[in-house]
Amino acid sequence: MRQYTLSFLFLIFSRFCFSQALYFPPNTGNNWDTLSPSALNWCPTKIDSLYAFLDSNNTKSFILLKNGKIVLEKYFGTHTQNSNWYWASAGKTLTAFMVGIAQQENHLSLSDTSSNYLGLGWTNCSPTQEEKITIRNQLTMTSGLDDASGDPDCTIDTCLEFLANAGSRWAYHNAPYTLLDSVISQATGMSLNSYFTQKVKNPIGMNGFYFYQDYNNVFFSTARSMARFGLLLLNEGNWNGNQILTDQDYFTEMTSSSQSLNPAYGYLTWLNNTNQFMAPYSQIVFNGSISPDAPSEMYAAMGKNGQFINIVQSEDL
């Protein structure tokens, strides 16, 4: 059986509609309003079965929000409300969100060649090939760099070989994504952690930090902080009246098909409303959606070993 180390997940138990204004927890302290499952007509035995399933699969923590309020919150083993845990590739969506902020502040444009920020020769491609790689290509996994050439996480120039013209091939490739961290830093003049703290962390009351591990820059936080970011996504970049991501066109693009090669991928965000999708580390096009049992409108930040933030806007989940 696959072992999950699930850091956070929005899960739908029913399509029962309980619409009301979104609630936002205070930016400081531990207070967070709750909503009883019984108020939503959810079955207690199914919740017990869910917790048993999560526990048997090595889950660390699980939170479900409805209208911004906590309906379910469960920690397993030694994991607690104050425990930090890695987001894995779910952190990609957080990075995409910050790229949007950097663009709205005129620090960069998605159509810019990445070389403007990473310097000439950041790849092992020819100058002409390299110049065609843009920030948008990094956001959409369409850099054209060879993801099967050695270590796919390696960000050293000699690891980044040409395989196809930028925009012509989709491949889940960590290295070009990771280099967006340097793009943000060079464009804004701030370290990635400092930019995150100023633009996202403090405005919504998160904790968390990026931490370099080998070639990867991995984000860590508590489950509740992950929930805060999920709530920010649910409200399209607005936190309790504070419009953090003002570029709504960017938010729409981030949570919509970004290219036709893999329609289930936006800007470092997975989409469930498509009839075909490609999976990481494969060139096979699969029929169906990434999560056929979930509502088609769901979009998700997804990381290995079950690090998920799933958003269903019509249900305020």
Regions found by a protein language model. Give the residues of each.
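A short, well-structured edge-of-sheet supersecondary motif
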Residues: 50-79, 309-310, 316
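Penicillin-binding protein/beta-lactamase superfamily catalytic region
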Residues: 164, 194, 205-313
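Active-site helix/loop module of the DD-peptidase/beta-lactamase fold
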Residues: 105-143, 190-222
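Active-site SXXK
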Residues: 68, 85-111, 138, 180-184, ...
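Bacterial Sec-dependent N-terminal signal peptides
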Residues: 1-21
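N-terminal pre-domain segments of enzymes
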Residues: 21-40
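A small/polar active-site loop signature that marks catalytic segments
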Residues: 140-212, 216
